[in-house]
Amino acid sequence: AYSYVSEYKRLPVYNFGL
């Protein structure tokens, strides 16, 4: 199943605390 959370977790901005 596709999860938008999985996409955000792979993005650099996620590590910034988004």
Curated annotation (Swiss-Prot):
- Give yes or no: UniProt keyword Secreted: yes
Entry GO terms, CC: extracellular region
GO BP terms: neuropeptide signaling pathway
Major localization listed first in the record, in broad terms: secreted
Protein name as catalogued: Cydiastatin-2
Query: Is Transmembrane helix tagged as a keyword?
Result: no
PTM Leucine amide: list the residues.
Answer: L18
What are the subcellular locations of this protein? Secreted
Protein family (similarity comment):
Belongs to the allatostatin family.
Keyword list, A-Z: Amidation, Neuropeptide, Secreted
